[in-house]
């Protein structure tokens, strides 16, 4: 169900979702949307165990706590199979409104390792000059 705008929304009850809580069928809820992550288990950067622990339930708060990247959020959309039935939405805990934050970053990959590497080089040069003077 990649293009939900072309099709009617498929609703799943909480009871239906809870049945999909194993490695053969791994469903979870994020922001009232239902995701089938069975084929993504082995690819998940945090390991498949993290997803299996959340399977069959609402993982919204844990998903937001981790602080997933924009790319991860876009990728997650490809696994949407429907939505939690409106009658069941009150049965799950609402995530704290303060947890729903996204950080847009214009920094690229090099800031994650080049800046620390240069800093380490500067510190080692300072140490070398300091020890050579004594």
Curated annotation (Swiss-Prot):
Ranges annotated as spanning the membrane: 109-131
Classification via SUPFAM superfamilies: Cytochrome b5-like heme/steroid binding domain
Gene Ontology molecular functions: heme binding; metal ion binding
One Gene Ontology cellular component: intracellular membrane-bounded organelle
Gene3D superfamilies on file: Cytochrome b5-like heme/steroid binding domain (3.10.120.10)
Chain positions with N6-acetyllysine modification: 7, 10, 19
Domain Cytochrome b5 heme-binding: from-to ranges: 9-85
Coiled coil: none
Family: Belongs to the cytochrome b5 family.
Protein name: Cytochrome b5
Natural source organism: Sus scrofa
Name of the gene: CYB5A
